[in-house]
A protein has these predicted regions:
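Metallo-beta-lactamase
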Residues: 48, 71-72, 77-81, 132-266, ...
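Active-site metal-binding motif and surrounding structural segment of the metallo-beta-lactamase
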Residues: 69-71, 81-126
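Conserved beta-strand hairpin/beta-sheet module of binuclear metal-dependent hydrolase folds
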Residues: 45-92, 97, 192-196, 200-206
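C-terminal regulatory/interaction regions
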Residues: 281-322
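N-terminal secretory signal peptides
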Residues: 1-12
Length: 322
């Protein structure tokens, strides 16, 4: 990937950049991204989950903390805007607890923006290798119309794993076991879940959303089929009592994941059917391919459709759709 890489394709073939140029889709990205990060404007709040687990909201993305006498685990570090407040809150809750391990569920700044504050020198930062790669390079995200610069090296994950590694992987913190694994090409190409088996809690990062359409970051490897597969994988790890922590917002249950899976599979089928007729995103939007889901999933369905098509084209339809 070059430093100034731009992911531009023929708009006559796909009809996507015409929509972007008109501003209809690109203007919506800021609204959806603001909604996804709306928690930055909230006060930090702590909700007890189970067995020493706490959910911290208002820091950007959801943050989960496990505190034990032997050590601590933190999943995600929120946004940079709230990093100092979050670090202070975590320190207050941990007290004199030994050094902790930090997990990053993916690279997005509302989940990794506080890494430097959350992870003093020497703290293990666990993530998929693709997350480290995105955090250490410069790249352009077309749907945001934004360049991302490399993060400071202190923020990079320093304990990464690959898709080929045996999974799930695990660490032990005192008597508590923490399991984690890769969710390939879903929200991004570096998504992971973090599972606390004893508490029956899964932290799903950006692969699960609460009451809004998922963000399909196709520039960094996400696509709708991969997200559907990731959702199925998470469902297989759940029972009726499992708590699933989404990227932002309220805790989800297995039934919520099943609804997300059904929505993703239905929308994918409709996108493929229209694309294989040689038609594009504007036709998909005009036909209202998400209309029965709009009441459940807030946000701009136009952006969701556009990003779903982009990711599907790059992952599966390129070379098939002329």
């Amino acid at each position: 990937m070059t430093a100034e890489a731009e992911f531009i394709v023929d708009d006559d073939r796909r009809g996507v950049l015409k929509a972007l140029a008109s501003g209809a889709v690109l203007a919506a990205t800021s609204d959806v991204w603001r909604a996804a990060r709306a928690a930055d404007d909230d006060s930090l709040a702590v909700e007890a989950l189970r067995g020493g687990l706490s959910l911290i909201t208002g820091a950007g993305g959801n943050v989960v903390l496990l505190a034990t006498p032997e050590g601590a685990v933190q999943v995600d570090s929120g946004s940079s805007a709230r990093s100092n407040d979050l670090a202070k809150l975590v320190a207050e809750r941990l007290g004199s607890s030994p050094a902790r391990t930090l997990f990053n569920t993916h690279w997005h700044l509302d989940h990794t923006g506080g890494n430097e504050a959350a992870a003093p020198s020497g703290t293990p930062i666990v993530a998929h290798e693709n997350t480290r790669l995105w955090m250490s390079t410069k790249f352009y995200v077309e749907w945001e119309d934004r360049y991302y610069r490399p993060r400071p090296k202190a923020a990079w994950p320093n304990k990464t794993f690959f898709s080929s590694d045996p999974q799930p992987l695990s660490i032990d913190v005192g008597k508590a076991r923490v399991e984690y694994g890769h969710l390939p090409e879903a929200h991004t190409d570096g998504d992971i879940y973090v599972r606390f088996p004893e508490q029956n809690v899964i932290v799903a990062g950006g692969t699960v959303t609460a009451g809004r359409y998922p963000v399909l970051d196709y520039i960094t490897g996400g696509w709708i089929g991969g997200l559907a597969d990731a959702t199925k994988k998470l469902i297989a790890l759940c029972d009726a009592e499992t708590l699933v922590v989404p990227d932002v917002g309220r805790v989800q249950k297995r039934a919520d994941l099943e609804a997300q899976r059904d929505m993703l599979e239905t929308v994918r089928q409709r996108i493929e059917a229209i694309a294989l007729q040689g038609r594009g995103v504007q036709d998909m939007i005009a036909e209202g391919i998400t209309k029965e889901f709009d009441a459940r999933y807030a946000g701009d369905s136009k952006l969701f459709i556009s990003n779903a098509y982009e990711g599907l084209w790059w992952s599966r339809l390129r070379g098939i759709v002329a």
